[in-house]
Curated annotation (Swiss-Prot):
Protein name (Swiss-Prot/TrEMBL): Small ribosomal subunit protein uS13
Function: Located at the top of the head of the 30S subunit, it contacts several helices of the 16S rRNA. In the 70S ribosome it contacts the 23S rRNA (bridge B1a) and protein L5 of the 50S subunit (bridge B1b), connecting the 2 subunits; these bridges are implicated in subunit movement. Contacts the tRNAs in the A and P-sites.
Region feature (Disordered): 92-126
NCBIfam families: uS13_bact
Assembly: Part of the 30S ribosomal subunit. Forms a loose heterodimer with protein S19. Forms two bridges to the 50S subunit in the 70S ribosome.
Keywords (A to Z) from UniProt: Ribonucleoprotein, Ribosomal protein, RNA-binding, rRNA-binding, tRNA-binding
Phylogenetic lineage: Bacteria, Thermotogati, Deinococcota, Deinococci, Deinococcales
GO cellular component: cytosol; small ribosomal subunit
GO biological process, one term: translation
Alphabetized InterPro entries for the sequence: Rbsml_uS13_C (IPR027437), Ribosomal_uS13 (IPR001892), Ribosomal_uS13-like_H2TH (IPR010979), Ribosomal_uS13_bac-type (IPR019980), Ribosomal_uS13_CS (IPR018269)
Family, per entry: Belongs to the universal ribosomal protein uS13 family.
HAMAP family in the cross-refs: Ribosomal_uS13
Annotated GO MF terms: rRNA binding; structural constituent of ribosome; tRNA binding
Length: 126
């Protein structure tokens, strides 16, 4: 099994798709890396030679920030927004949508499941 950037790539998949299992590499970046290294996108991971694996590893490590480094950078950016008191940081802190989406309805992914509030009680007549 090929191991790139600390991630085991699935053996049966095409290398173009398998590279997207690495955090920070999508389909476009995957194609860029393959073009840069000269490896065919149709090659299966199990058919990669040791030399091809090492060139892939080197190309990804030199060109992109991936996996742990990228995750920590994103986390630090969010923390910085919170620390300086930016509006976006406030939205992150409160667990609300950051990019201007509406919250009167929807936004359930960000807010979590509904918290049911008891309705108003009717006063009984005497």
């Amino acid at each position: 099994m090929a191991r790139v950037a600390g991630v085991d790539l699935p053996r049966e998949k095409r290398i173009e798709i398998a590279l997207t299992y690495i955090y920070g590499i999508g389909l476009t970046r995957s194609k860029e890396v393959l073009a840069q290294t000269g490896i065919s996108a149709d090659t299966r991971v199990k058919n990669l030679t040791e030399a091809e694996q090492s060139t892939l590893r080197d190309a990804i490590e030199k060109t992109f920030k991936v996996e742990g480094d990228l995750r920590s950078e994103v986390g630090q950016n969010i923390k910085r927004l919170m620390d300086i008191g930016a509006y976006r940081g406030l939205r992150h802190r409160r667990g609300l949508p950051v990019r201007g989406q509406r919250t009167k309805t929807n936004a359930r992914t960000r807010k979590g499941p509904k918290k049911t509030v008891a309705g108003k009680k009717k006063a009984t007549r005497k």
